[in-house]
Amino acid sequence: MAAWFWKGKGEGEDRPKKVNIAEGLWVKCDSCKEIVYRAEVDRAGRVCPKCRYPFRIGARERIAAIVDEGSFEEREAGLSSRDPLGFKDTKRYTDRVKAARSKTGLEEAVLTGLARIGGHPLVFAVFEFGFLGGSMASVVGEKLARAIELAIQKRLPLLIVSASGGARMQEGILSLMQMAKTAAALKRLADERLPYISLLTDPTTGGVTASFAMLGDLILAEPRALIGFAGPRVIAETIRQPLPEGFQRSEFLLEHGQLDLVVERREVRETLRRIIGFFAGRSLPAP
């Protein structure tokens, strides 16, 4: 009769050995669902070696991947969120902000400053999705507005790398106001005929998509990034119809004329260098 269960005869006799695998050695790809070796993902710039899906990365990693080494000079680092509405849901808003600061090491969901790409100077802003979903609070809007004014003052191109769930609900109408505030600041930049490049990463949604993220002179995106206003599940439940294949992904938007270019992560830096170099070669107009 076949044995359905294995039973060791004694301690140490032909017993299968337990293999200890270090925690964090492997990671699951959100796109192809493959379990891949983390070191391979890191070597590829946080990109899945199986399907080329770009994993989400933080603001500091993004800076290291895009701008010239050591060239980023942060501005407005002292600005931080308050609690204008005394907001509380399951937690106090102030406690959520403290936890986000501890988790990311940042004061807010966006870093802004001066940088260089390929030796070309520019004003650079980059979102940290790990900070309350990269949500746009009043301080985020203020930092972006000041970055835009800095670009005008110094006659420099502007690059914003977005990764956000939209406006921060804990600040209510004050967060929604940042949509108009950033759009108005970008109108001044456009009036000065200074270039604005918008790079959309996964995810870029809500009030961020409905304002500055889609106002670039050139709008680039990483592959398979989720880009939209409401999420696909909400839309499908509202219209009660199935959504098209790839709906709200960067390739779908490119196909429908809402993006200029979808760029593999390993090519982002060189693509931006060429774009900014083109504008630099044109000599940006004086005021």
Where are the regions that the model predicts?
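Cys/His-rich microdomains that often coordinate metals
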Residues: 35-36, 54-55
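Cleft-lining beta-strand/loop regions that shape enzyme active-site pockets
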Residues: 111-190, 197
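An N-cap/entry alpha-helix motif that binds or orients negatively charged groups
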Residues: 12-16, 27-28, 55-112
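Conserved catalytic cores of soluble enzyme domains
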Residues: 162-280
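Residues immediately within or flanking Cys/His clusters that coordinate Zn2+
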Residues: 26, 45
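N-terminal alpha-helical interaction blocks
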Residues: 1-17
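Short cysteine-rich clusters marking metal-coordination/redox-active sites
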Residues: 29-32, 48-51
